[in-house]
């Protein structure tokens, strides 16, 4: 499809020269058009178990998704090299192993909004309904509209790309980058102190959320002539709503928490481990724990604000299960 000519970041390689890169080529879409487009989105195999029986939620390959362009307040199908501006994520369908993730749209929206109210820079996401199709509509942060009205792609790389690793090894246990390696890259960002603490605290909140898919491809940096810096957070989903469907050892974090021993298994990680983890990611451990204490104090208000923002068709049970799981860790 023409939408398939879009790309992440700013560089696109094509087999033949492409005309019209300095103009917007758009086809207007009504809500009914979008409903049909979402319904016809190609379904792929979603989640499963790795060879080592570790449950992974890889959103990049799990959710059915498409992308469209919002221009002058209306939705369009982009043609040629015209960039998309928003990603549409559809609910993850029931899996062959019986796992039900049909509320994945509500789950991801809740996690992102909750983290925004905790002070994190996260991708802007809203739940939208087009006829009988429900989707999480995520604004792309690697796009920018210029003064000339054109939509430009911004250069970004995920942490696997930035650290020269294959995307297939995005999980640390499979050879992907871990927290210390990513933190070392952020030591030299153009906003190093803020980026390093944001990254550390994001890992902590992923633990609260049971966000076990926080792998290296779910953290990215912008790049320009001045250097690199952390992008907004994205692709956050909680396993709290379906944790009871898995054995204890199956729920593992994408990156280990480093203490006297290294910890991947979510249930083995304790509050005290984060102090050592901070030190091993080049941070002042006392200051880092102070930030955690302050964040914990904001959790109740952040949860309340998130529920207050929920639309009428939001699945409240999903939010309740995530909130209960978060509070069970904060109140230890």
What are the functions of these language-model segments?
Residues 1-332:
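Phosphate/dinucleotide-binding and metal-coordinating scaffold of catalytic cores
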């Amino acid at each position: 499809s023409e939408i398939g000519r879009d790309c992440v970041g700013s560089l696109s390689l094509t087999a033949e020269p492409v005309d019209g890169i300095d103009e917007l080529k758009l086809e207007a879409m009504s809500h009914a058009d979008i409903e049909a487009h979402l319904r016809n989105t190609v379904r792929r195999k979603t989640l499963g178990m790795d060879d080592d029986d570790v449950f992974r939620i890889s959103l990049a390959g799990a959710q059915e998704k498409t992308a469209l362009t919002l221009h002058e307040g209306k939705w369009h199908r982009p043609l040629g090299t015209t960039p998309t501006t928003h990603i549409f994520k559809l609910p993850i369908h029931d899996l062959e192993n019986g796992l039900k993730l049909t509320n994945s749209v509500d789950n991801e929206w809740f996690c992102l909004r909750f983290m925004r109210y905790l002070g994190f820079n996260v991708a802007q996401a809203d739940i939208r309904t087009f006829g009988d199709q429900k989707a999480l509509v995520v604004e792309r942060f690697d796009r920018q509209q210029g003064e000339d009205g054109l939509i430009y792609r911004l250069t970004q790389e995920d942490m696997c790309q930035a650290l020269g690793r294959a995307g297939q090894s995005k999980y640390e246990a499979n050879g992907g980058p871990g927290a210390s390696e990513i933190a070392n890259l952020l030591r030299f960002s153009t906003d190093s102190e803020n980026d390093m603490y944001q990254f550390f605290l994001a890992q902590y909140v992923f633990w609260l959320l049971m966000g076990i898919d926080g792998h290296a491809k779910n953290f990215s940096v912008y790049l320009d002539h001045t250097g690199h810096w952390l992008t907004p957070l994205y692709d956050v989903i909680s396993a709290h709503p379906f944790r009871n469907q898995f054995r204890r050892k199956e729920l593992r974090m994408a990156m280990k928490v480093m203490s006297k021993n290294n910890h991947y298994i979510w249930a083995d990680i304790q509050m005290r481990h984060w102090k050592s983890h901070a030190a091993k990611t080049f941070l002042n451990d006392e200051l880092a724990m102070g930030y955690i204490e302050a964040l914990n104090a904001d959790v109740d208000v952040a949860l309340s604000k998130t529920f207050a923002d929920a639309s009428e068709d939001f699945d409240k049970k999903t939010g309740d299960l995530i909130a209960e799981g978060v509070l069970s860790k904060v109140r230890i």
